[in-house]
Design a protein with these regions (language model features):
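N-terminal metal-binding scaffold of metallo-dependent hydrolase/deaminase domains
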Residues: 1-45
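Residue-level marker for buried hydrophobic side chains located in beta-strands
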Residues: 4, 61-63, 188-189, 273
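Divalent metal-coordination and catalytic microenvironments
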Residues: 8, 26, 31, 55, ...
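Metal-associated gating/positioning segment near the N- to mid-region
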Residues: 48, 52-116
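Active-site mouth loops of central-metabolism enzymes
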Residues: 65-78, 133-146, 193
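Short, acidic/polar
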Residues: 76-84, 142-153, 199-208
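Divalent metal-dependent hydrolysis catalytic cores, especially in the metallo-beta-lactamase
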Residues: 83-112, 127-141, 155-168, 186-189, ...
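Active-site core of metal-dependent hydrolases
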Residues: 158-281
Length: 282
């Protein structure tokens, strides 16, 4: 299948340099960009579909790096249907699960948390709501998960893990488990700030994050309760290369502060943007 988009207006290549595309036309073949150039170089008979952008702006699809999938385009937490399809209207074409923690009666035993992650990964591998790519199946870290469990999960296609909702006595108890998950090749996101749902840690602060060294400090501007200004400074200055995930469901003042810190310390490449929706707190 060949689709040509012509007469593109302003464009953005998705980098911090904000460079425009090298042309006003794009050709996609079998779902991937195959060519970028001038509209004048295209012939109508060479492509099955030609879309005239009529000067519209073209940017890469946006990625929501923190949402909570269950199964299907539905969450029982707010009894909401079709939210992923709705997000597509805002330009989001890819979503990354921050665990299936909102599944009613979710298991917390070793076998159950692995099964839940694998089931979610498999379901969304075969299901794209309105074409949105969903990376689901984020294993919720529990104290009894071992290095062998993480290796098994990775072989089974699970590559995401979430710290913050397991039955750990203190945030520091996560440290060896997070490190074992990362050693197996999983990308670990850690809940940051105050607790959001019953049964989770009351707070995961800078000390614990720096000790854990997750790949991503999830909703680092609060989910919904933010860290202190001093902790923000520590995460930015001492926490390299931990990604700093800012969410719309968090604290706006803290998000601005973190952006200012990242800019001042040359850490803008660590900033991620996400929604953290559907939220645990409504």
């Amino acid at each position: 299948v060949s689709v040509a988009v012509i007469n593109i207006g302003p464009s953005h290549d998705g980098t911090f340099a904000a460079a425009p595309l090298p042309g006003d036309a794009i050709v996609c073949e079998n779902g991937a960009i195959a060519w970028i150039g001038s509209s004048s170089d295209l012939r109508s008979g060479d492509h099955e579909t030609i879309v005239d952008a009529a000067g519209a702006t073209v940017i890469p699809g946006l990625i929501d790096s923190h949402f909570h999938s269950t199964f299907g385009d539905f969450t029982p937490r707010q009894n909401t249907v079709g939210y992923l399809e709705s997000y597509l209207h805002g330009g989001m074409t890819r979503a990354i699960s921050a665990s299936e923690v909102h599944v009613p009666g979710r298991p917390s035993d070793r076998v159950g948390v692995k099964a839940l992650a694998v089931a979610a990964q498999r379901c969304f591998a075969n299901y794209r709501p309105w074409g949105v790519t969903v990376h689901a199946g984020s294993v919720i870290l529990e104290p009894d998960l071992t290095a062998d469990d993480f290796a098994e999960l990775r072989r089974d296609g699970v590559w995401l893990a979430k710290a913050g909702f397991g039955a750990f006595a203190t945030p520091m108890d996560y440290v060896p488990v997070v490190r074992a998950a990362r050693a197996a090749g999983l990308v670990v996101m850690c809940h940051t700030g105050g607790g959001s749902i019953s049964g989770s840690q009351t707070k995961i602060g800078a000390d614990a994050l720096l000790a854990m060294q997750p790949n991503v400090a999830g909703h680092v501007n609060g989910g919904p309760t933010a860290l202190t200004a001093e902790e923000n400074e520590r995460i930015v200055i001492e926490g390299k290369p931990i990604a700093l995930q800012l969410v719309q469901a968090g604290n706006l003042r803290s998000a601005i502060h973190l952006c200012e810190l990242a800019l001042a310390h040359g850490a803008l490449e660590r900033i991620l943007i996400a929604s953290d929706t559907p939220t645990g707190s409504g």
